[in-house]
């Protein structure tokens, strides 16, 4: 006998969040699991910095085995789709290109925009004929608009900021009102095999890597000088300016100096890293920025009530936003530190996430910071 329930395709990753998302949806929907494979270490020359390259079974296949077991436990069908080439073309090439320019990109945001909520969604709607898609993201949908999750510590709306209104239209976030502890409790109560599985970390779909080594697979290491920006004196040598981020304090290997340093800028063309003494924090300070590629997922917001995050897990800053032509925005804020070109500025109206843009230039009192 056919039921009248709508169908939802859940992105089953083999982790506890997507497992519980699938379990919760079973109460009201016909649930189909879909596992994505987006990275192949052998095809993608992922050797340096990869602790698992010599394992008999790669982490993605172990995750797939867990997803298969969850599907069996929940009695739902599971399909598998391969986006290795597309992930490289749409996400990873941009990631490497940005690092080559000395910028710090956010691959998770592009992965959501081009893979999870585009290619994955199209496969679910066109091939599996679903009514909705769902993921284990910590985020909330209300009346077709994106909001922060109830668990503010885990909220992932920041990473969904480049999704269009159209992409969000048929998305369900079953974990929107739950904390991580509550999710693990549900998983234990249902004896799900992922109940105690540790959270995935590292680069979206690639995993944990020794980051500088990992980048050397794609960007050759080239040593250069480290300059103290306060006096232009050489204070050390770096192993490649692509491997350092603005605000970085650890791993600089600048021993023998009177005080510790932090990275405050870089000149990729000259292969120079600029550092400043910890007692001089002003080289990280700014109070406005220019951003490109603005994406707004709604026009329903109060321009006078906007706040922004300049990186994930950061407190909101109150902002004034000037909307310019060609999807550029100028953003004004009280003094903030270590805002970095290539990262995403994400806008909120209270709890509502209205979109985001890519940080291009940083200013202090309307003067562009050229050493970034």
Swiss-Prot record:
BP-aspect Gene Ontology terms: tRNA wobble position uridine thiolation
Gene3D superfamilies attached to this UniProt entry: Adenine nucleotide alpha hydrolases-like domains, HUPs, Translation factors
Highest taxon in the source lineage: Bacteria
Annotated region (Interaction with tRNA), positions in chain: 154-156, 311-312
Active site positions: 111 (nucleophile), 204 (cysteine persulfide intermediate)
The UniProt record lists the keyword RNA-binding: yes
Membrane listed as a keyword: no
UniProt region (Interaction with target base in tRNA), positions on chain: 106-108
Primary site of residence: cytoplasm
Protein name in UniProt: tRNA-specific 2-thiouridylase MnmA
Protein source organism: Mycoplasmopsis synoviae (strain 53)
Organism ancestry: Bacteria, Bacillati, Mycoplasmatota, Mycoplasmoidales, Metamycoplasmataceae
Gene symbol of the encoding locus: mnmA
């Amino acid at each position: 006998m056919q039921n009248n329930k709508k169908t939802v395709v859940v992105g089953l990753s083999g982790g506890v969040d997507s497992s519980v998302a699938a379990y919760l949806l079973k109460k009201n929907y016909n649930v189909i699991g879909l596992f994505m494979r987006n990275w192949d270490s052998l095809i993608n020359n992922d050797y340096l910095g990869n602790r698992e390259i010599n394992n008999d079974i790669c982490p993605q296949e172990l995750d797939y085995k867990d997803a298969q077991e969850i599907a069996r436990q929940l009695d739902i069908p599971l399909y598998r789709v391969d986006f290795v080439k597309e992930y490289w073309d749409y996400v990873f090439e941009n990631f490497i290109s940005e690092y080559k320019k000395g910028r710090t990109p956010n691959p998770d945001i592009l992965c959501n925009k081009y893979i999870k909520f585009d290619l994955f969604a199209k496969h679910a709607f066109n091939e599996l004929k679903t009514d909705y898609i769902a993921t284990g993201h910590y985020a909330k949908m209300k009346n077709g608009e994106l909001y922060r999750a109830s668990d503010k510590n885990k909220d992932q709306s920041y990473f969904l900021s480049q999704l269009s209104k159209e992409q969000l239209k048929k998305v369900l976030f079953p974990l929107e009102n739950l904390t991580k502890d509550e999710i693990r409790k549900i998983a234990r109560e249902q004896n799900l095999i992922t109940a105690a599985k540790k959270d995935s970390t590292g680069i979206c779909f690639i995993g944990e890597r020794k980051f500088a080594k990992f980048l050397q697979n794609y960007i050759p290491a080239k040593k250069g000088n480290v300059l103290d920006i306060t006096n232009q004196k050489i204070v050390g040598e770096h192993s490649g300016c692509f491997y350092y981020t603005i605000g970085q304090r650890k791993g600089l290997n600048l021993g023998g100096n009177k005080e510790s340093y932090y990275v405050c800028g870089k000149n990729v063309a000259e292969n120079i890293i600029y550092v400043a003494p910890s007692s001089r924090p002003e080289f990280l300070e700014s109070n406005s920025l220019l951003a490109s590629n603005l994406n707004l997922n709604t026009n329903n917001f109060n321009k006078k009530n906007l706040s922004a995050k300049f990186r994930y897990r950061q407190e909101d800053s109150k902002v004034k936003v000037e909307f310019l032509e060609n999807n550029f925005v100028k953003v004004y804020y009280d003094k903030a530190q270590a805002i970095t070109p290539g990262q995403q500025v994400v806008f909120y109206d209270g709890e509502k996430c209205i979109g985001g843009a890519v940080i291009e230039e940083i200013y202090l009192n309307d003067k562009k910071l050229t050493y970034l």
